[in-house]
Amino acid sequence: MKTAVAGYPRIGTLREIKCALEKYFRKEISADELTQTAKELRKTHWLIQKEAGIDYITSNDFSYYDIVLDTAFLLNIIPERYKELEVSELDKYLAMARGYQGENGDVKALAMKKWFNTNYHYIVPEAEDSTQIRLTGNKLWAEYAEAKELGIETKPVITGVYTLFKLCRFTGKKRADDFINAFVEAYKDVYSKCEAVGIQWLQFDEPALVQDMTEEDRELFVKMYSDILGKKKSCKVLLQTYFGDVRDVYEDIVKLSFDGIGLDFIEGKKTAELIEKYGFPKDCLLYTSP
């Protein structure tokens, strides 16, 4: 048996990142000082886990504001009103989270919604008809490289394709289905880049799988991951679920070629029953909650 964490709290024991952001918004520190604080915080968190003997340490779980927003930004799901701001990439990202009013423009923040059954709120991704969903960012690999420099091999985490698609708001005339292929291709590119740099494990977080799913939802999930996993080579893929059990889609999950599956045994009332009834792949690692 080995130990793993799905993700580590990012704010800091003394709320370092929150305090640094507030200073940045008040123009009391520079962008470089903010990013340095973030880098030091990531280092501290990785070293804590390493010293605790964690076998599978996660990277890309850090965020200045929200992990869903991070994924949307990584994949160019950025409304035009933010792209038009003549500010840095960091400030565009923060404008999506909290709005921007200044000499370079005036935009409101994206909407916020409750993150499943928690008191946390996420930033709702917004795709317009003109949105070209594709891999454009580098955050995941930059933070993996940071940990690697410390001698720590991590498994990067990213909001999964199904969950991101389901959480996304489509504001134009195009239907949500018109974007499915672009979502899948972007995630295939994420996997390919992880493979290219030698990442050993990639974690897809899919909390949306614990919600009620229609037959159409199941088919969409299977189609998305059949395509993504079709690219699989040496980089292993972990499907991580939480906030309940995956009763509507468990049979489909265990038939796909995931190398690891994370299941919730705390809030997942039927998780043990599902494994007993349908079994679990022999060549797949089971990630469980304590």
Give the ranges of each region predicted by the language model:
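Domain-level signal for soluble alpha/beta catalytic cores
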Residues: 1-289
